Amino acid sequence: MAASSSLDHLSNRMKLEWHSKLNTEMVPSKNFRRTSIIGTIGPKTNSVEKINSLRTAGLNVVRMNFSHGSYQYHQSVIDNAREAAKTQVGRPLAIALDTKGPEIRTGNTPDDKDIPIKQGHELNITTDEQYATASDDKNMYLDYKNITKVISPGKLIYVDDGILSFEVLEVVDDKTIRVRCLNNGNISSRKGVNLPGTDVDLPALSEKDIADLKFGVRNKVDMVFASFIRRGSDIRHIREVLGEEGKEIQIIAKIENQQGVNNFDEILEETDGVMVARGDLGIEIPAPKVFIAQKMMIAKCNIKGKPVICATQMLESMTYNPRPTRAEVSDVANAVLDGADCVMLSGETAKGNYPNEAVKMMSETCLLAEVAIPHFNVFDELRNLAPRPTDTVESIAMAAVSASLELNAGAIVVLTTSGKTARYLSKYRPVCPIVMVTRNPAASRYSHLYRGVWPFLFPEKKPDFNVKVWQEDVDRRLKWGINHALKLGIINKGDNIVCVQGWRGGMGHTNTVRVVPAEENLGLAE
């Protein structure tokens, strides 16, 4: 079987038949990865040169973790990322701000010393301020004032990612809970606390989060990864804080607790996208159930046509080792097969010894995992699940993807203002790349969230429109997009290109699909 020529034709088979035809000699027919890669920038990668090296390896989105670092440090990341983006004109690099989120922590022990505690030991957990700096094995302070109102006997309390666990015996009064320690460990200062199975009423944003979001608005970040989202109203609150100036910033809801899973449908209605944040989620719910939650959330995002990111510990061993474990590679591949639009690296690129190698490994794994996707079947299922009647833009996107599959097209080239049409095209998961051409700088960056989309920023200003000038401008942008795709090797000369455009300028008018050949001197307007 020819390695590259057979792939596109085989992908219309049923899933089991398609998988049975795979072999290790198969390679993608084009050097095109559909899944975007998000990388956290830390001290080891915070320079223009190192960010460019990560981009060469396959990075699409720069992430800043606001649980760590000063504003001065994060400003340097933004400045370095924007300087790095200038080296590839027209190829945008997105910037994401990951909030710390509201959290519960223990108090301080005397002199911040660890205090040993034995399994079976009973003590009080208290919100009394007198113990805020005097936590010990008799009274351990928590900074969540309402804990006595929401917790009940039999519930669990995890400290320091579950290293120390307690069972609630009794709610004594409005400040005190009697608990039993479930394992040997140490009571330490300022450790994070999880309350699995308990509906907490923490605010969506802390004061620090609000200040951080305003910093992001001032610096025109492209997306916010909002931590510990529990309900749809949390997203509305974040949107209010971002305000008019931050209206183009995409809000990605991080689902990290049982409440977020339980309220996922209402969150999905409000948010621009979702992150399956498996670290804290694996503490809040039993670890064997995390993969069920992951599959559910990714599937619902795919059906809704909203981007979804899979994150946490994906190639964690590469923080210190040059090669990942086989389980980690399978984890990345399975996230791609589940339908993730993006995968994310944290410590691997922020503090790891092998950041470039980690991005390259993730890129190669995604590229090969995409070979195993039966795209025709995925398209048919998504089309059948689409609500009826669909709006015009989604109908055109559906028709364009169908045409691209039937024609074995080299690419879909879409002209868009807001990126909405590109998002709908991405929803239906074409085999070929989606070459997005836009004049909107923000859309060109945040569209990295959409699987299969290669966004390009068109450099020419919008002309004063009449019908003739508008059509010439449309053809000029299409030709520009095709030529850039040819130069980058995304498509080949002679490929069929499905072009998607509007019938007039502005947002919301996409209604035209046409097919042209990929040629450098394409007979469109100059």
Swiss-Prot record:
Disulfide bridge map: none
Binding site for substrate: 63, 279-280, 312
Binding-site positions, Mg(2+): 256, 280
Biological pathway: Carbohydrate degradation; glycolysis; pyruvate from D-glyceraldehyde 3-phosphate: step 5/5
Binding of ATP, residues: 65-68, 105, 191
Keywords of this entry: ATP-binding, Glycolysis, Kinase, Magnesium, Metal-binding, Nucleotide-binding, Potassium, Pyruvate, Transferase
Enzyme Commission number(s) of this protein: 2.7.1.40
Residue sites binding K(+) per the record: 65, 67, 98-99
Main EC class the enzyme belongs to: transferase
Gene Ontology molecular function: ATP binding; kinase activity; magnesium ion binding; potassium ion binding; pyruvate kinase activity
Cofactors, names only: Mg(2+); K(+)
CDD domains linked: Pyruvate_Kinase
Family membership: Belongs to the pyruvate kinase family.
Subunit annotation: Homotetramer.
Name the UniProt record assigns to this protein: Pyruvate kinase
Gene designation: pkiA
